[in-house]
């Protein structure tokens, strides 16, 4: 399994007696893992219960979206609402693999110039550190000199919400950003070979492209 956080989720599931699932798909996955079987439900001497609670991340995103405009992140980066692309790259299988990182940045440059659109990329410290090492010198120079591909410092939670809700498109390898793009009804390109949030792809709101 490539996603460490998914391993953590499974471990937490196994240790829990009450599970709150965000979707019906998640409940079905628990069923496939045997959580509805009698011997599993009463494994620790008391019934293990599963509830469809809805996704509290959705409530959280909508709540803070009311305040995100206070950040002025769009104005400070000369961005117009619904006229830019938000990108994030931080997963080690992308940042630590020169071929994958090169492919992603070549694609970002191509999209920005072909479509004449700004792409804003808040740089994760991991990505920032590895770009000079894992990008070819020629590509690295093009990236840092590009006027359309805007590399900026990491942003706050509210600033990220503001960038997500006003983007035309989101390109990301982040699980959380995928979901927030979905909540704000933004199409999402997923830079991973798989996603744990299968509902996003099933509803046609995201596409898995890998790198």
Predicted features by range, described:
Residues 21, 51-53, 150-153, 207-211:
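Short acidic-hydrophobic, aromatic-tinged amphipathic segments that line or gate anion-handling sites
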């Amino acid at each position: 399994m490539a996603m460490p956080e998914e391993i953590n989720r499974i471990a937490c599931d196994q240790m829990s007696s009450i599970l709150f699932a965000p979707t019906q798909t998640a409940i079905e996955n628990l069923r496939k893992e045997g959580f509805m079987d009698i011997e599993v439900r009463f494994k620790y001497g008391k019934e293990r219960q599963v509830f469809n609670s809805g996704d509290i991340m959705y409530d959280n995103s909508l709540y803070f979206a009311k305040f995100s405009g206070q950040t002025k992140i769009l104005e400070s980066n000369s961005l117009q609402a619904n006229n830019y692309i938000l990108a994030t790259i931080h997963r080690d299988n992308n940042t630590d693999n020169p071929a994958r990182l090169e492919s992603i940045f070549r694609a970002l440059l191509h999209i920005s110039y072909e479509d004449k659109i700004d792409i804003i990329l808040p740089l994760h410290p991991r990505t920032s550190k590895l770009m000079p090492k894992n990008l070819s010198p020629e590509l690295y120079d093009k990236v840092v000199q590009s006027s359309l591909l805007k590399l900026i410092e990491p942003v706050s939670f509210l600033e990220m919400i503001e960038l997500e809700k006003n983007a035309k498109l989101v390109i990301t390898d982040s699980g959380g950003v995928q979901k927030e793009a979905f909540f704000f009804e933004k199409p999402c390109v997923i830079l991973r070979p798989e996603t744990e949030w299968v509902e996003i792809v099933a509803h046609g709101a995201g596409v898995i492209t890998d790198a």
